[in-house]
Protein backbone atom coordinates (compact mmCIF):
# COMPACT_ATOMS: atom_id res chain seq x y z
CA UNK A 1 0.00 0.00 0.00
CA UNK A 2 1.32 3.42 -0.90
CA UNK A 3 2.03 6.19 1.59
CA UNK A 4 -0.89 8.18 0.21
CA UNK A 5 -3.25 5.22 0.73
CA UNK A 6 -1.99 4.69 4.29
CA UNK A 7 -2.54 8.38 5.06
CA UNK A 8 -6.14 8.18 3.84
CA UNK A 9 -6.85 5.02 5.87
CA UNK A 10 -5.29 6.57 8.97
CA UNK A 11 -7.32 9.77 8.52
CA UNK A 12 -10.57 7.80 8.21
CA UNK A 13 -9.79 5.76 11.35
CA UNK A 14 -8.95 8.90 13.36
CA UNK A 15 -12.12 10.68 12.20
CA UNK A 16 -14.24 7.66 13.14
CA UNK A 17 -12.66 7.54 16.60
CA UNK A 18 -13.29 11.26 17.18
CA UNK A 19 -16.89 11.18 15.93
CA UNK A 20 -17.71 8.16 18.10
CA UNK A 21 -17.12 10.25 21.23
CA UNK A 22 -19.67 12.94 20.34
CA UNK A 23 -23.34 12.60 21.30
CA UNK A 24 -25.68 12.17 18.36
CA UNK A 25 -28.26 14.64 19.70
CA UNK A 26 -27.87 17.42 22.24
CA UNK A 27 -29.37 16.29 25.51
CA UNK A 28 -29.03 12.61 24.71
CA UNK A 29 -31.89 10.22 25.31
CA UNK A 30 -34.20 11.79 27.87
CA UNK A 31 -37.36 9.90 28.75
CA UNK A 32 -39.48 13.05 29.03
CA UNK A 33 -40.18 15.05 25.91
CA UNK A 34 -40.89 18.67 26.72
CA UNK A 35 -41.22 20.24 30.15
CA UNK A 36 -43.94 17.92 31.51
CA UNK A 37 -47.12 18.63 33.45
CA UNK A 38 -47.19 20.99 36.43
CA UNK A 39 -49.21 18.79 38.78
CA UNK A 40 -50.93 15.41 39.14
CA UNK A 41 -53.64 14.39 41.61
CA UNK A 42 -51.85 12.87 44.59
CA UNK A 43 -54.54 10.17 44.87
CA UNK A 44 -53.71 8.98 41.32
CA UNK A 45 -49.97 8.49 42.00
CA UNK A 46 -48.84 4.87 42.29
CA UNK A 47 -45.06 5.27 41.90
CA UNK A 48 -42.52 8.07 41.57
CA UNK A 49 -39.24 7.75 39.69
CA UNK A 50 -36.64 10.50 39.82
CA UNK A 51 -33.93 10.29 37.21
CA UNK A 52 -31.02 12.63 37.84
CA UNK A 53 -28.83 14.08 35.04
CA UNK A 54 -26.46 11.64 33.35
CA UNK A 55 -24.30 11.54 30.25
CA UNK A 56 -27.38 10.51 28.25
CA UNK A 57 -29.75 13.23 29.50
CA UNK A 58 -28.65 16.51 31.03
CA UNK A 59 -31.83 17.26 33.01
CA UNK A 60 -33.60 15.91 36.08
CA UNK A 61 -36.74 13.96 35.19
CA UNK A 62 -39.64 13.18 37.52
CA UNK A 63 -41.76 10.34 36.13
CA UNK A 64 -45.07 9.57 37.81
CA UNK A 65 -46.75 6.19 37.29
CA UNK A 66 -50.50 6.56 37.70
CA UNK A 67 -52.87 4.06 39.28
CA UNK A 68 -55.45 2.05 37.35
CA UNK A 69 -53.41 1.69 34.15
CA UNK A 70 -53.51 5.39 33.27
CA UNK A 71 -49.88 5.25 32.22
CA UNK A 72 -47.04 7.57 33.09
CA UNK A 73 -46.65 11.32 33.15
CA UNK A 74 -43.56 13.47 33.26
CA UNK A 75 -43.76 16.10 35.95
CA UNK A 76 -42.01 19.41 35.34
CA UNK A 77 -39.07 19.33 37.80
CA UNK A 78 -39.37 23.11 38.26
CA UNK A 79 -43.03 22.86 39.32
CA UNK A 80 -43.98 23.22 42.98
CA UNK A 81 -45.33 19.64 43.29
CA UNK A 82 -42.23 18.13 41.67
CA UNK A 83 -39.90 20.08 43.97
CA UNK A 84 -41.84 18.80 47.00
CA UNK A 85 -41.66 15.21 45.71
CA UNK A 86 -37.91 15.44 45.02
CA UNK A 87 -37.30 16.89 48.48
CA UNK A 88 -39.35 14.12 50.13
CA UNK A 89 -37.54 11.36 48.21
CA UNK A 90 -34.13 12.86 49.05
CA UNK A 91 -35.08 13.10 52.73
CA UNK A 92 -36.31 9.49 52.71
CA UNK A 93 -33.11 8.29 51.01
CA UNK A 94 -30.86 10.19 53.41
CA UNK A 95 -32.66 8.63 56.39
CA UNK A 96 -32.36 5.21 54.77
CA UNK A 97 -28.59 5.48 54.31
CA UNK A 98 -28.06 7.26 57.62
CA UNK A 99 -28.66 4.00 59.53
CA UNK A 100 -26.06 2.04 57.57
From Swiss-Prot:
Q: Which GO terms describe its molecular function?
A: chemokine activity; CXCR3 chemokine receptor binding; heparin binding
What intrachain disulfides are recorded? Answer: 30-57, 32-74
Q: Which UniProt keywords apply?
A: Chemotaxis, Cytokine, Disulfide bond, Inflammatory response, Secreted, Signal
Instruction: State the GO CC annotations.
Output: extracellular space
Question: Where in the sequence is the signal peptide annotated?
Answer: 1-21
Q: Which GO terms describe its biological process?
A: adenylate cyclase-activating G protein-coupled receptor signaling pathway; chemokine-mediated signaling pathway; chemotaxis; immune response; inflammatory response; positive regulation of release of sequestered calcium ion into cytosol; regulation of cell population proliferation; T cell chemotaxis
Respond yes or no to whether keyword Membrane is given for this record. no
Question: Which superkingdom is the protein from?
Answer: Eukaryota
Cited PROSITE patterns: SMALL_CYTOKINES_CXC (PS00471)
Q: What is its main location?
A: secreted
Pfam families for the chain: IL8
Cellular location(s): Secreted
| Subunit field text | Interacts with TNFAIP6 (via Link domain).
Concerning its family, UniProt says:
Belongs to the intercrine alpha (chemokine CxC) family.
Please state what the protein is called. C-X-C motif chemokine 11
- Biological source species: Bos taurus
Q: Which gene encodes it?
A: CXCL11
Amino acid sequence: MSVKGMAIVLTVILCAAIVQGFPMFKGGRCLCIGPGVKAVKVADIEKVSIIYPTNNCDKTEVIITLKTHKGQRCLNPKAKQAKAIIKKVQRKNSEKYKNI
